[in-house]
């Protein structure tokens, strides 16, 4: 009886190991997927949790290599975050104020997404890259990866990446050292769509106050 139980346990463990994806192979497949992209358009939902509060926002995201991104928030408040790779702007029409900073100085929670904009290598960017079997994916067929961004470890504890079977990243969860977290969910992804450089330029509307410095939301 004990022998049968032991054999059954070993067979089960072997099956689990056989079905679990290889982290290096999966990471390389994700790298290859994003390295061939020139542009990406997606709908996003941003979920923030921290300081006893929760906030949910949504809109449309455009990315273009090298280093360009535009986030257009529609709900619950209209606002824009845009970077042409040199300058970054954060603008809330209702406030009539635009904040500007150099993109290279940007310490924004969106900055971990920058690896989607250039030559990516997850194993190089994320220390301790591994599977996260303790984290439930949104879709059963997805796989969740865990890692610590080497360049941002002073303010980020870990990043979780949910990867779909076609190697698209459909969710990014960022846990910060202050106990807060920001989650991005991406749907309706469109790859290599025409996007002009003008979409990543920002000109403050007349009557808008411009503030140089951080881009706090």
Say what each PLM segment does.
Residues 50-51, 70, 77-80, 90, ...:
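Short beta-strands and strand-coil junctions in structured, solvent-facing domains, enriched
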Residues 124-214:
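Gly/Pro-enriched, hydrophobic low-complexity segments
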Residues 44, 69-73, 88-91, 147, ...:
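Short hydrophobic/aromatic-rich beta-strand segments that constitute the beta-sheet cores
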Residues 60-112, 182:
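An acidic-aromatic
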Residues 19-48, 54-55, 82, 92-156, ...:
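Flexible, processing/modification-adjacent segments and terminal tails
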Residues 1-13:
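Bacterial N-terminal signal peptides
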């Amino acid at each position: 009886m004990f022998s049968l139980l032991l054999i059954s346990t070993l067979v089960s463990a072997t099956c689990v190991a056989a079905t679990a994806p290889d982290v290096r192979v999966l990471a390389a497949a994700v790298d290859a997927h994003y390295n061939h992209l020139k542009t990406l358009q997606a709908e996003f939902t941003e979920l923030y949790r921290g300081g006893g509060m929760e906030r949910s926002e949504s809109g449309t995201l455009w990315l273009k290599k090298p280093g360009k991104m535009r986030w257009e928030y529609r709900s619950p408040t209209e606002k824009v975050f845009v970077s042409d790779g040199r300058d970054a702007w954060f603008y809330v029409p209702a406030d009539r104020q635009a904040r500007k900073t150099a993109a290279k100085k940007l310490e924004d929670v969106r900055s971990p997404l920058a690896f989607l904009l250039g030559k990516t290598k997850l194993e190089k960017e994320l220390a301790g890259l591994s599977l996260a079997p303790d984290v439930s994916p949104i879709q059963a067929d997805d796989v969740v990866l865990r890692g610590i961004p080497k360049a941002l470890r002073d303010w980020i504890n870990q990043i979780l990446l949910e990867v779909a079977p076609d190697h698209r990243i459909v969710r990014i969860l960022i846990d910060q050292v202050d106990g807060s977290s920001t989650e991005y969910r991406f749907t309706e992804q469109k790859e290599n769509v025409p996007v002009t450089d003008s979409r990543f330029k920002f000109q403050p509307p007349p009557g808008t106050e411009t503030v140089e410095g951080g881009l706090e939301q």
